[in-house]
Design a protein with these regions (language model features):
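SAM-dependent methyltransferase catalytic region
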Residues: 2-138
Length: 138
């Protein structure tokens, strides 16, 4: 289990309660389903440093942690230095949108516990990301 997986597990404890799900309409995808979905992708995606990945409803990072793990492994030949490889993945390949500020803080702690990376996280509803606000009524 990676450091990020352990941190995610810690953040999930007590967070994914019925009350939280009811109040925030949050339901987290179980890791085994994420693995199953990602297994359907062409294996070459894990060794391509030019690919970008978007999690439009990032939550606590369930998808991102597993994608990060696969990219760290798949990009070894491209970048042998593990620290530079992880930095490239987190700063240039992974992008997140999450509208719950509490979840964003937890996501930052999971992916960047020591604050060393510049993560790409927008605390906003993905469906309105990049739209100009308008006062017009339709």
């Amino acid at each position: 289990m990676t450091k990020e997986e352990l941190l995610l597990q810690q953040e999930m404890e007590g967070y994914n309660t019925y009350e939280k799900r009811k109040n925030n309409d949050e339901v987290f995808t179980p890791p085994h389903l994420i693995e199953e979905m990602l297994d359907k992708l062409d294996p070459s995606v894990w060794s391509d440093p030019s690919k970008t990945w978007l999690d439009p409803c990032a939550g606590l990072g369930n998808f991102s942690v597993i994608i990060l793990k696969r990219l760290v492994e798949g990009l070894k030949e491209w970048q042998p230095d593990p620290e530079l490889r992880k930095k490239h993945i987190l700063e240039k390949m992974l992008y997140h949108a999450e509208m719950n500020p509490e979840s964003v803080k937890k996501l930052q702690r999971v992916l960047n516990p020591d604050g060393r990376y510049r993560l790409n996280i927008k605390c906003q509803d993905f469906l309105t990301l990049g739209q100009k606000k308008s006062s017009a009524l339709f």
